[in-house]
């Protein structure tokens, strides 16, 4: 038997799909040449058949003289027709073993590594098997760009395993949801309405700020951020800032926590009766105008009402006729009610009544018709000395 026949016999011993041992003969930048043990033929092991990382260094995976188990993929004929070479793969052999290990592991949580952002989701690798996480299963919120997960290792839940169709689907969202639920239950177990706790500002919206309480986000509504009115949330807090907040309400079923920042600091109405009293005359700024009056800020955070009837001695239909927002005015305090957080004010109490108006009132009083004075009924006798006549003189000529 000649050398060529020996070569053919050795080739016949190698079949596509076989798992064989191979010794590394040489290594260059992109591939390694191996000798398939017991056959007398060689194989080619490319970087692509070693790892999914296209930027990897092949020397990190194989060394000359090292013996590896590889999977025979197909026969490759070289330029010399007498030379037969096989393309082999270490990566696919490991993947086959990994697929076998995946059978029956649906719903199990495993750690994967993100390899590439693709259309519709993220490619990941787990023990040599390439898997896929749809974008809708990456997070609790839809992820439009999966690039941030590339190169990251994270826990996922196995949802589908089908080796024949090379289908390996996982979900990161379910793991995140489970972790969030566990953290939420733990946090809710420690919280109570009325507690003052420390949290970190997670995000700011037009209607308030969300505070991270260590697993649960609570909302400080715009109205609970400050004692001042019409403030912008961004002017009160900043993202990342740690603040103390008071718990107003808890709803574990809905995962909702209502918080207040202003309840943790003294309010403008605290001790207001020592700062403001009935009869005081103070300067203020018109803050708001309504149909029934004007609200004037007399102390920081304290607006008093000047009723429309207290704006001027003249009759006005609308406060806008006499005042405008931002105007500085002098007012007299008519009443202070700290419990009701109400202050009544007057502008006209500091103004003299117009002389013309006083004259008109006097004229009205003078022109008013006087009612006749009632005469008292009296029983009396007319003495003769007063009339000069006696009763006989008055009725003497009357014939009966």
UniProtKB/Swiss-Prot annotation:
It comes from the Bacteria. Signal peptide: none annotated. GO terms for cellular component: cytosolic small ribosomal subunit. Residues 351-366 have a biased composition (Basic and acidic residues). GO terms for biological process: translation. Phosphorylated. One of its GO terms (molecular function) is mRNA binding. InterPro entries: NA-bd_OB-fold, Ribos_protein_bS1-like, Ribosomal_protein_S1-like, S1_domain. Keywords: Phosphoprotein, Repeat, Ribonucleoprotein, Ribosomal protein, RNA-binding. Residues 351-400 are annotated as: Disordered. Gene3D superfamilies: Nucleic acid-binding proteins (2.40.50.140). PROSITE patterns: S1. Residues 17-87, 107-173, 194-262, 279-348 form the S1 motif domain. Binds mRNA; thus facilitating recognition of the initiation point. It is needed to translate mRNA with a short Shine-Dalgarno (SD) purine-rich sequence. PANTHER family: 30S RIBOSOMAL PROTEIN S1, SMALL RIBOSOMAL SUBUNIT PROTEIN BS1C. Belongs to the bacterial ribosomal protein bS1 family. This is Small ribosomal subunit protein bS1. It comes from Streptococcus pneumoniae (strain ATCC BAA-255 / R6).
